Amino acid sequence: MWKSVQKRDRIIWKSGNPYEAGTDKTFSLDTLPQEYTAYGNGDYRINGLETEQADGSDTANLKYESYEISKGKYSLKGLPEMFAKEDEAETLEIVLKDHASGLRAHLLYGVFPQLDVITRAVRLENTGTAPVTVKKAMSMEMDYEYRELDAVHFYGKHNMERQMERTHLGHGLWKTETFLRLRK
């Protein structure tokens, strides 16, 4: 058993650690489940956010700034979404900030208790003085340690996404995405 602990410890030590972890070898962003990550901080898994700052740097170090719980569900103007009356849902908004660039990521969670549904979205806000180019922004990411899980999603053509599909989540990456081609 000691050999496996030593081996695991060496692996974690080689992974990138945030400055705040100091010499703590048991902490690594590369092995911990995280809510929403940005490129370039020692987590070598697929990140939800990739940006480029005006100076060419491509790292965003998102840190917790605040949260707010409000009645009703958040709105996504111009995008498809679930709707609810104010008394049918609540919104949890968690704000993460990259202090170097001023970029804020607003993580939005729509909670529908009667339906057993949680919706997710991300809104980005540049509060800095320089432009930030967004290369990739996913509405969510989930890290799970080894469990027996299924993903349930709906697919179909435009305004007809009603075909339910259940997929077993095995080792590795699983994603669902939509490809939309805009015409002029």
Q: Where in the sequence are the language-model features?
A:
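Polysaccharide-binding surfaces and accessory modules of carbohydrate-active proteins
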Residues: 1-184
